[in-house]
Amino acid sequence: MAVALDSQIDAPLEVEGCLIMKVEKDPEWASEPILEGSDSSETFRKCFRQFCYEDVTGPHEAFSKLWELCCRWLKPEMRSKEQILELLVIEQFLTILPEKIQAWAQKQCPQSGEEAVALVVHLEKETGRLRQQVSSPVHREKHSPLGAAWEVADFQPEQVETQPRAVSREEPGSLHSGHQEQLNRKRERRPLPKNARPSPWVPALADEWNTLDQEVTTTRLPAGSQEPVKDVHVARGFSYRKSVHQIPAQRDLYRDFRKENVGNVVSLGSAVSTSNKITRLEQRKEPWTLGLHSSNKRSILRSNYVKEKSVHAIQVPARSAGKTWREQQQWGLEDEKIAGVHWSYEETKTFLAILKESRFYETLQACPRNSQVYGAVAEWLRECGFLRTPEQCRTKFKSLQKSYRKVRNGHMLEPCAFFEDMDALLNPAARAPSTDKPKEMIPVPRLKRIAISAKEHISLVEEEEAAEDSDDDEIGIEFIRKSEIHGAPVLFQNLSGVHWGYEETKTFLDILRETRFYEALQACHRKSKLYGAVAEQLRECGFLRTPEQCRTKFKSLQKSYRKVKNGHVLESCAFYKEMDALINSRASAPSPSTPEEVPSPSRQERGGIEVEPQEPTGWEPEETSQEAVIEDSCSERMSEEEIVQEPEFQGPPGLLQSPNDFEIGSSIKEDPTQIVYKDMEQHRALIEKSKRVVSQSTDPSKYRKRECISGRQWENLQGIRQGKPMSQPRDLGKAVVHQRPFVGKRPYRLLKYGESFGRSTRLMCRMTHHKENPYKCGVCGKCFGRSRSLIRHQRIHTGEKPFKCLDCGKSFNDSSNFGAHQRIHTGEKPYRCGECGKCFSQSSSLIIHQRTHTGEKPYQCGECGKSFTNSSHFSAHRRVHTGENPYKCVDCEKSFNNCTRFREHRRIHTGEKPYGCAQCGKRFSKSSVLTKHREVHVREKPLPHPPSLYCPENPHKGKTDEFRKTF
């Protein structure tokens, strides 16, 4: 607040029977000098803070000047460390105060922290006394006795009228006896005359309610008279619009005061019509403002609301019918600044208390990602004084769940601050036991309408997959309801997220081994009702799964089983025996409940066989083992699961053509001109050369004798396995589809692009690549064909890296990069070359390596015609022609066009030598120098030397893998 100026009350003058009071400044108080020492110290402090670099000639002089000013301000030769620290804290304390209060407090020059706090406390007490005095009703006819005369202090930023000591005598137990006496010891005290009867002054009601320097009318009554006399105008400087937002208590004080007296105030002899302002006051709104939209004002209002609630026991306001959470989204950027990202302790406790209400978690049970639920939670938070968006509420709850799981599983050392609250929310056993009452009301701080039913046994558990391949498409909050089946609590120890536990997978396979399930899967592997029944069986056993999750899990088990059986992976499948018993025993078993197939008209009458695009069953894989390896080793192509999820193609009849006709009983001729994928021909040759496990025989007579052909262990061709001729059109269609890898036929042709495909699913995949990309990035405008690709791309703009390595702390924005990074720590190298047996941790590295055996160099320079096997080498070569040097050293400003040379150059400045000799221990900054150094040991002792290790001195500056070079 501003400096309080005393009101020196001169001797009263009798003019025509009226008592005239004159208010003027106290010259002694204004002209009294400040204590020595404090003035000089404050002067040096201001000089130190306001010092400019332009005032001196150079940096040395600037530093010396600052040192001198700081020493003169803090005086380290006289003060101790604690005193200097106290001065710095006092300065910061005065800085964080509101602007006007800060100016008033700085003029007092407090010498200690207690004195600075006492100044602010004194101001708050004065404001509280002002509230109590003004809140008393104003009577026109009936006036208080002379002994109860009082004067209202105006806490203006520039001037504050202080009560005379006569009022203090009326308050023997005043709380201002401490610091108030120290401030008023220099003031002249003059008691009011006994014949004076002052009436309370009120600010004039101007049209804008914020007029500066208002003329305030004070009514004085003559001695023994009851009629008001002509007023005497006393000029008071009052800037209400500025001070009302700086001191919330004074704002509320004057709001209540004006509401009571707005009809009785007379300013300058004219009444003011204030019906609209009274209406706004009744609605708890300020009559002088239309809305508070600035961040500073909102934060002050919020703190004032919390303060009033704690001091005056104001109840939580009823739910307003005004702005809802949807309208919050239309607020400006300033509201987003208030919302922020950080959640305080009190805000989080309130948030968890709201979520404990039964209607919220019951609604989330039905729909985990219900935006309306989080919108209602955000509205409740807003009523409690916290502004949050629905998306922020959802993200916060997700983060709390993640921290709770880490602490519970022992993955995080530091404790979760809200572990007990989350445990009570997510664990039914942690809740209080139910009493005789059906619903027990548990009191929640700051919320009186939230009732928690202790009888509700619902656990909200969310498990995220570390790889997050689906990009939260199937990840959400899953609710587990306890089953009455014996042993269900043990099963509930497994988290019900995307991850499947061992016991849950065993139960899932046991359910699939039932006759009704595998026979239905035999007919159609994508039947949603079938997986829905499996999900129901899992739910009865205590595991909550969706039909889509069951289908995806079964597909994943099929893929793992196929890889292990064909020797494509080194590690064994945990459920290999169960899958082998499920597939092999059921494949040859008869199907008594299978409906008889209706024989269709012979296709010989039409002169040929027209192979229709039919969807493969669950017992017949969509891709061969060779194609599966291609998709595993090349991350740019669509995965097998993505192909399965493509809808069945339904296009015009003329879109698919079969150029070759096959007759039953006729021999199938081999076509030497095979139509292959133009963009995958070389990669297919590489993979087939390294992963081929069957012979490429084209003799149709040997086809029926082979039980495992091209790795297709999922085929359900009873006629082929038993050596019987296939008479049914369905079996014949499968035989034709199977013979295509041997005859090279690709009957499906896309007319628009002229490319042929061997399977209808491949055609649909190709059409997917050529269609319009519906998912567009709002930042850069890039389009994508799948939503998960857009989500993964948006992390580039937001900088989000949700995948964090627990070993080194490095974060990634993509699950594939995170998985490749984890192989560095585990040493896993699942990709093996079929020629030399060398293993790699990434599929892209295997593809690049295989080009050394085939001699393929797909990247050719258009300028000089030079070819490269690696895209990075090709990009570095192009910079030779363009002259681009993107890698610039910050120390010497030297530029490089190659990142490898740039890293070698950086080691000159850092002194890093990551390459060390295993024999003599010498270290080098370049691998080429280490190679030359090895020749010295070879000449001395011509024996095979041990490989030297790449051990960087600073693991954050160099590579982390081993460096080995052989001769």
Swiss-Prot record:
Taxonomic superkingdom: Eukaryota
GO molecular function, one term: DNA-binding transcription factor activity, RNA polymerase II-specific
Modified residues annotated as Phosphoserine in this record: S591, S600
Domain (KRAB): residue spans on this chain: 229-300
Coiled-coil segments on the chain, per record: none
Residues annotated as domain SCAN box: 45-127
Locations listed in the record: Nucleus
Entry annotated with the keyword Transcription: yes
GO BP terms, alphabetized: regulation of transcription by RNA polymerase II
The protein, known as: Zinc finger protein with KRAB and SCAN domains 2
